[in-house]
């Protein structure tokens, strides 16, 4: 039977709604919070100026995991007649005797809660101080967890001003979004009053209380910037401080809008679920995303700190000053911050070739968006629990990639001018995706909305098939799906085309399924024989689509590759497209191997990084698809990657480039994983020296992962000395990066007992919940059954320990995607049939689809008659 409709006028009418009603909105919050870090609880009181704009007897706001003192609730002196807390909906409904007066009134209430250990809401994080374990109090409110700290209108569109007061132990540092206005000390407790904030959304309110050191800088406008670290680690904050100051200066100039707050603090938090969080004026980070130590940090971690800081500070404009109206438009926050971070870091470190590395983001988005279980950039959100799952490669990486495509189409100058207008128009308020398109259209005069709606409102992207017919070029678009089916989508595609030259470009908009470019051959230099004629679509991979060439054009491109006629970005695009077409069984694995072989003299970090991803993927699938050939395929890839690895060696060279410093460990790790004996033996030798002398120059931070994997290569239950040595390194290391490095290798082993021991570390105090993904990510194909059995046996425990956190998705994704058969997909589906929750439902569906995609790819590979011949031919080629 269907449930009866809620009686008119009852609190039940507000249940099951995606959003809060609009008849009342907060204008200003006065909050006082008293965290008790020993008892891990907090008390608080709120006084909220509420504007009632339509006749109502109700006030409806969000609250969750809080005890609200019902007797304390008053609105303009009136006590509610009914107080209903609906836990599933996370709403608090206050019902009054008569209609509330229109206009502004004050809602007051007291409440209390627990400083939880779930890394959301108002929570506790453990740290060591002088040999003692202490708690700090931290907030993490995005997306929907401010309601776990204080009752509020917890939606981005309800912007209000915030005036915070904290009562904390006198010896502690207490930070919030705004600077301290005044402070009074009464014995062991100090009361800190903060300045009132400008209009802002609840998810950006932040508090951090603990013991900290800091380093300080100042922007060109005089804004004070600080990086707070655990006591004794402040020198590790200097690099992030430098990037922070430079980023604020860069964005101020780019948007022609000053940083809106008087100060910016960045704080390293030991327990932190995300990589970082852009709270207005008080940005919080995982330690490894903020701290950099010249002695113990690798080049890739240094780059990660720069990109992460630049990303979070871009949010101070795109997200905080101008905020998305609802979570459907999350991509406006994350896509733009991702794109802007590359723009700014490229200006700080042009030698890093960061835009070439940006293609990692595009590849990641193309991979997810070629699944039927992907979602549009603009995704409908019906329940708070669904929001966490869209903080994914679509919102971040596809968002950033289509922004890059649009900037390329409009031109950098027009694009910047439009963004500046947009920021100024919507400052201190909210915007939807359409609002951005309207400003871009107004400034550029181009049909931006029609073009971009095809990319943000529909899921997926096209593959453009290119055929040479006489002197003409035929183009056809189809939705690209890895499962081999074809969707019905049609996109307006900004096509760029290079003919025999990177510089001679043709541009057009492909608006229909088919198009013809007439006399393309005569427009290029005359069609020469001898391999000089070639055509490349999607120059520098600025477009978010794949390209499939006919045989003649494919051969010509391979020649152009070998003759080094293409840009690095174009080389990457060709490799990634060929890999995806192979997985989708639209091209043979043999043709992919021939293409990879054309890169045998490659030396560039970004290109080799993508080749390494492809060789790793093919090596793994070959274990199941062609077990007899798997060894030879690995040898072929060793042949490909060994020359650049030999050239770089294990030891860094004086004055070498940042990119070579990142290339060395990537190649060494790849060779170890492919089973190259010499590399494994050398890694093991260097580890033994390092284990006895941590200061040896023979194992730098960059090359340690390769050495650790070399150690694990020979570990078993009967030969566990290497494993125990790595555990000792883990336990003795004070640096977060070093701990992560070891964690990522401990489960990289075929031995069942060792794998289980490593996975069970997740349940101990030795591994912080935020780092569990590292252990999971290390599991190799040969140990997948062990890991799957462990996941099933421990699912209830995992669900409890990681509930309410996006981290639970890591368990599913890491283990499920190791499988490649329809039978296994059915078994896993059956297990989760009664265990799925909205917080990880999308991840589970995507992971299961990936299993079926792999199963189909295996069938395709097994059907290739000439694969063995190709492998042996390439393997024995001089």
Curated annotation (Swiss-Prot):
Classification via InterPro entries: Aminopeptidase_N-like_N, Aminopeptidase_N-like_N_sf, ERAP1-like_C_dom, M1_APN-typ, Peptidase_M1, Peptidase_M1_aminopeptidases, Peptidase_M1_dom, Peptidase_M4/M1_CTD_sf
One Pfam family from the record: Peptidase_M1
GO MF entries: alanyl aminopeptidase activity; metalloaminopeptidase activity; peptide binding; zinc ion binding
Keywords: Aminopeptidase, Cytoplasm, Endoplasmic reticulum, Hydrolase, Membrane, Metal-binding, Metalloprotease, Microsome, Protease, Zinc
Binding sites annotated in the UniProt record for substrate: 142, 275-279
GO cellular component: cytoplasm; endoplasmic reticulum; extracellular space; membrane
Site (Transition state stabilizer): 396
Listed EC numbers: 3.4.11.2
Assigned protein family: Belongs to the peptidase M1 family.
Swiss-Prot/TrEMBL domain comment: Dileucine motif seems to be involved in protein-protein interactions.
Protein name, entry field: Aminopeptidase M1-C
Species annotation: Oryza sativa subsp. japonica
């Amino acid at each position: 039977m269907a449930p009866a409709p809620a009686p008119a006028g009852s609190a039940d009418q507000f249940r099951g709604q995606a959003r809060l009603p609009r008849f009342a909105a907060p204008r200003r919050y006065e909050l006082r919070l008293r965290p008790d870090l020993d008892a891990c609880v907090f008390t608080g009181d709120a006084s909220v100026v509420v504007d009632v704009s339509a006749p109502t007897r109700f006030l409806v706001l969000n609250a969750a995991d809080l005890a609200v003192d019902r007797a304390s609730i008053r609105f303009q002196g009136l006590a509610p007649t009914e107080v209903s807390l609906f836990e599933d909906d996370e709403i608090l409904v206050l019902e009054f005797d008569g209609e509330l007066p229109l206009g502004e009134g004050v809602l007051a209430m007291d409440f209390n809660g627990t400083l939880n250990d779930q890394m959301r809401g108002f929570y506790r994080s453990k740290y060591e101080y002088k040999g003692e374990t202490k708690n700090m109090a931290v907030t993490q409110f995005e997306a929907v967890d401010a309601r776990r700290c204080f009752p509020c209108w917890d939606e981005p569109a309800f912007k209000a001003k915030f005036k915070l007061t904290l009562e904390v132990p006198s010896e502690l540092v207490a930070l919030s979004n705004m600077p301290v206005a005044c402070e009074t000390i009464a014995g062991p407790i100090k009361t800190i009053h903060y300045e009132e904030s400008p209009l802002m959304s609840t998810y950006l309110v932040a508090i951090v209380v603990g013991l900290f050191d800091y380093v300080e800088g100042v922007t060109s406008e005089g804004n004070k910037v600080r990086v707070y670290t655990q006591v004794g680690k402040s020198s590790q904050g200097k690099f992030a401080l430098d990037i922070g100051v430079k980023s604020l200066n860069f964005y101020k100039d780019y948007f022609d809008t000053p940083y809106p707050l008087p100060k910016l603090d960045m704080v390293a938090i030991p327990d932190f679920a995300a990589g970082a969080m852009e709270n207005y004026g008080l940005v919080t980070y995982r330690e490894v995303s903020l701290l950099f130590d010249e002695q113990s940090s690798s080049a890739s971690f240094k780059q990660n700190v720069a990109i992460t800081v630049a990303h979070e500070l871009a949010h101070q404009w795109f997200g905080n000053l101008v905020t998305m109206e609802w979570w459907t438009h999350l991509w406006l926050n994350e896509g733009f911050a991702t794109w802007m971070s590359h723009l700014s870091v490229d200006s700080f470190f042009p030698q890093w070739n960061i835009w070439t590395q940006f293609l990692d983001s595009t590849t990641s988005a193309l991979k997810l968006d070629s699944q039927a279980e992907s979602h549009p950039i603009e995704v409908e959100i019906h329940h708070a629990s669904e929001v966490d799952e869209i903080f994914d490669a679509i919102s971040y990486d596809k968002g950033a990639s289509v922004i890059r495509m649009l900037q390329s189409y409009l031109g950098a100058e027009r694009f910047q001018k439009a963004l500046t207008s947009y920021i100024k128009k919507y400052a201190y308020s909210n915007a939807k995706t359409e609002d951005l398109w309207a400003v871009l259209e107004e400034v550029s005069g181009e049909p931006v909305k029609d073009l971009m709606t095809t990319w943000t409102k529909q899921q997926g992207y096209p593959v453009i098939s290119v055929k040479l017919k006489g002197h003409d070029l035929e183009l056809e678009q189809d939705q690209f799906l890895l499962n081999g089916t074809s969707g019905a989508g049609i996109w307006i595609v900004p096509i760029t085309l290079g003919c025999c030259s990177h510089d001679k470009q043709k541009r057009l908009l492909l608006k229909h399924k088919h198009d013809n470019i007439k006399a393309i051959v005569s427009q290029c230099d005359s069609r020469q024989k001898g391999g000089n004629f070639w055509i490349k679509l999607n120059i520098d991979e600025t477009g978010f689509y794949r390209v499939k060439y006919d045989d003649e054009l494919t051969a010509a491109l391979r020649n152009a590759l070998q003759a080094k006629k293409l840009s690095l970005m174009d080389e990457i695009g060709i490799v990634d497209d060929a890999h995806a077409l192979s997985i989708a069984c639209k091209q043979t694995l043999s043709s992919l191997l021939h293409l990879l072989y054309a890169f045998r003299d490659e030396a560039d970090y970004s290109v080799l990084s993508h080749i390494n991803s492809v060789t790793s993927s093919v090596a793994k699938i070959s274990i199941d698809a062609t077990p007899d050939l798997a060894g030879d395929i690995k040898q072929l890839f060793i042949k490909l990657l060994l020359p650049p690895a030999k050239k770089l060696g294990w030891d860094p060279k004086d004055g070498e480039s940042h990119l070579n410093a990142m290339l060395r460990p990537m190649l060494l790790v790849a060779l170890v994983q492919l089973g190259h004996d010499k590399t494994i033996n050398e890694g093991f030798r260097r580890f033994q020296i390092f284990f006895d002398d941590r200061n040896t120059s023979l194992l730098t931070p960059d090359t340690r992962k390769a050495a650790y994997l070399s150690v694990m290569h020979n570990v078993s239950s009967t030969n566990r000395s290497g494993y125990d040595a790595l555990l000792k390194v883990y336990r003795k290391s004070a640096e977060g990066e070093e701990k992560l490095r070891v964690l990522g290798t401990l489960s990289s082993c075929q031995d069942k007992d060792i794998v289980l021991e490593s996975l069970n570390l997740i349940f101990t105090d030795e591994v912080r919940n935020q780092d569990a993904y590292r252990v999971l990510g290390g599991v190799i194909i040969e140990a997948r059954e062990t890991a799957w059995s462990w996941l099933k046996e421990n699912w209830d425990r995992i669900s409890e320990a990681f509930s309410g956190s996006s981290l639970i998705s890591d368990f599913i994704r890491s283990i499920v995607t190791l499988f490649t058969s329809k039978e296994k997909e059915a078994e896993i589906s059956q297990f989760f049939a009664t265990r799925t929750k909205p917080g990880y439902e999308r991840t589970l569906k995507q992971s299961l689809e990936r299993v079926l995609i792999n199963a189909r790819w295996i069938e395709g590979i097994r059907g290739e008659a000439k694969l063995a011949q190709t492998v042996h031919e390439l393997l024995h080629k001089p």
